[in-house]
Amino acid sequence: MKITDHKLSEGIALTFRVPEGNIKHPLIILCHGFCGIRNVLLPCFANAFTEAGFATITFDYRGFGESDGERGRLVPAMQTEDIISVINWAEKQECIDNQRIGLWGTSLGGGHVFSAAAQDQRVKCIVSQLAFADGDVLVTGEMNESERASFLSTLNKMAEKKKNTGKEMFVGVTRVLSDNESKVFFEKVKGQYPEMDIKIPFLTVMETLQYKPAESAAKVQCPVLIVIAGQDSVNPPEQGKALYDAVASGTKELYEEADACHYDIYEGAFFERVAAVQTQWFKKHL
């Protein structure tokens, strides 16, 4: 395969993998999760898809990795714009069959693929793994009514302060993504990838709270495969099942790795099985 790096006019850094052969290839754009960068977790999937005959693109959202933009600013609507910017660039590449563009998303990116597909008919196929359906339920679902009211009041006060003063609190990623799985993962990777050791606005919690990928999934008509991990404590499998139920497309499947945790899917036997299932889905529907 041929691997090249590019920087788009929007400031988005991407890596473009193309299989051997002078033909127009179908394309899979891989969309990362919460504060993810393209060199972490994604290459194994990108390489597997490219070896199977698909061109692939991995990229950094604006504000993360090698892309331009305010460091750590995570806004789902902006990240969806980034996906569409990548589609715009990709369809102009001579080696790409622009009638066969698919999206693959993981975790938060597994929600973004629905947001993008709902806005852009060029998306012909989706794989979404380890995603959530409703950010409000995800963030506040285990709170009682009093705890939820207090939590939302605190967020609203912080948002008002930002509006009035322009100042806001920035925290480490694991202050927001605070489950034990994520704490272990981010502690492990930030030594190898210092660009993962960033501060993000605490109000990112509010962005997550207001994000409901299921609403976009209800507008999507292209084939959809949803992958869940049965032991996922980041985005519990019930969220993935709710997302599956919301998908409007008549061509949809739900695949579960019952014994896997959130970060298990990227390596070992779990990865091998999931990548094979996803590759077959793209071969059939893209």
Curated annotation (Swiss-Prot):
Domain named AB hydrolase-1: which ranges?
26-268
Q: Which UniProt keywords apply?
A: Plasmid
InterPro entries documented for this protein? AB_hydrolase_1, AB_hydrolase_fold, Polyketide_trans_af380
Q: According to its UniProt record, what is one Pfam family this protein matches?
A: Abhydrolase_1
User: Does the record bear Transport in its keywords?
Assistant: no
- Ranges annotated as spanning the membrane: none
Which pairs of Cys residues are joined through disulfide bonds in the record? Answer: none
Per the record, the similarity remark reads: Belongs to the AB hydrolase superfamily.
Please state what the protein is called: Uncharacterized 31.7 kDa protein in traX-finO intergenic region
Q: Which organism is it from?
A: Escherichia coli
